[in-house]
Amino acid sequence: MSRIGKKPVQVPAGITATVDGQKVTAKGPKGELFFVANDEISLKLEDNAVVVTPLNQSKNARSKWGMSRTMIEGIFKGVKDGFERKLEINGVGYRAAMQGKNLQLALGFSHDVVYEPPVGITIAVPKPTEIVVSGINKQQVGQVAAEIREYRGPEPYKGKGVKYADERIVRKEGKKK
């Protein structure tokens, strides 16, 4: 039995949640999101909470049970507070700047890298060495942050590159003479 799945998801104050068959829709101050559950999962709205239950005890249904509950919790948090991911840039001459809606990165290439964020994602550059990716969809925020990091990931010798703010780089020692 899923310890995560059996807990009902409370609908926070200020959010309107509707359940229509396999689809949960949440409307809040930041926007609107929906989640469509697997056919083997049952969704009910009871006492201002969404109850997630598997329709049968198959391995597939049980594996989707906890994931569905977590996804519903994620859309509630997204439409209420939103998600953000911070990135840091280390290295001489490495910097970021906004160019309209696009992010312009100087990462040691012969050209500047220009990243156009998808719809629903906001990118901010508080300092030339900091990038903040924010939005209401947790998966999309993480995906955009990963794509930006991929342009020049941190290298293990000097730690140069783009890294997550909470990421710890395992450093290596250089060659010995």
Swiss-Prot record:
One of its GO terms (molecular function) is rRNA binding. It comes from the Bacteria. GO terms for cellular component: cytosolic large ribosomal subunit. InterPro entries: Ribosomal_uL6-like, Ribosomal_uL6-like_a/b-dom_sf, Ribosomal_uL6_a/b-dom, Ribosomal_uL6_bac-type, Ribosomal_uL6_CS. Gene3D superfamilies: Ribosomal protein L6, alpha-beta domain. Keywords: Ribonucleoprotein, Ribosomal protein, RNA-binding, rRNA-binding. The keyword Transferase does not apply. One of its GO terms (biological process) is cytoplasmic translation. Part of the 50S ribosomal subunit. This protein binds to the 23S rRNA, and is important in its secondary structure. It is located near the subunit interface in the base of the L7/L12 stalk, and near the tRNA binding site of the peptidyltransferase center. NCBIfam families: L6_bact. Belongs to the universal ribosomal protein uL6 family. This is Large ribosomal subunit protein uL6. The lineage of its organism: Bacteria, Pseudomonadati, Pseudomonadota, Alphaproteobacteria, Hyphomicrobiales. The gene is rplF.
